[in-house]
């Protein structure tokens, strides 16, 4: 919150995830409803998808997710040294933020594709993997997405994806 990347909208109290360009200018905002009965999700008009919600670390790894909440859920399950790695949420099944991050961070040598465990997510994982000319691996959540994996792990089920970090 101190970096102004997540905040609460004043109108509907949505969580807003902000993506910045390499000059620190906000270029993308994704809203997600915070009320259980409200599953609202959407990008703010005029958002540039190549700058969607992301975190730049210093390691050679980047993890790409469909949604910011999945990215944060994954980090919650893998807290140790999480700041070292880079993470991005496409806010869709697009690869634009990934290729922007690769362009901005030439030290990245390993891509982990972490889209949802559904047809759209897995099709996107394969499509993007085919485009990459660097080391990549597809990580599939056990349940529908990484947020569900976190929810179930908090209920006592085994956490997912130990080997990655």
Predicted segments with their positions:
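TOPRIM fold recognition
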Residues: 76-165
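Conserved catalytic motifs of the protein kinase core domain
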Residues: 12, 60, 110
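Short amphipathic alpha-helical face segments that pack within enzyme cores
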Residues: 69-73
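Helix N-cap/beta->alpha junction signal
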Residues: 66-67, 117
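Cytosolic beta-strand hydrophobic patch enriched in CBS
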Residues: 16-19, 63, 88-90
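Basic, glycine-enriched DNA-binding surface that flanks or lies within the catalytic cores of DNA
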Residues: 1-56
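A short, charged/proline- and glycine-enriched loop
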Residues: 56-62
């Amino acid at each position: 919150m101190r970096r102004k990347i997540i905040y609460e909208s004043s109108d509907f109290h949505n969580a807003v995830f902000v993506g910045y360009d390499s000059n620190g200018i906000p270029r993308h905002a994704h809203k997600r409803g915070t009320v259980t009965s409200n599953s609202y999700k959407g990008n703010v008009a005029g958002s540039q998808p190549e700058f969607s919600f992301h975190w730049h670390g210093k390691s050679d790894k980047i993890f790409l997710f469909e949604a910011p909440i999945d990215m944060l859920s994954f980090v919650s399950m893998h807290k140790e040294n999480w700041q070292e790695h880079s993470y991005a949420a496409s806010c869709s099944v697009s690869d634009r933020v990934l290729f922007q991050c690769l362009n901005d961070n030439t030290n990245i040598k390993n891509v982990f594709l972490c889209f949802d465990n559904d047809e759209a997510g897995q099709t996107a994982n394969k499509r993007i993997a085919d485009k990459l000319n660097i080391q990549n691996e597809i990580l599939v959540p056990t349940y529908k997405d990484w947020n569900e994996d976190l929810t179930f792990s908090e209920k006592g089920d085994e956490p997912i994806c130990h080997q990655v970090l």
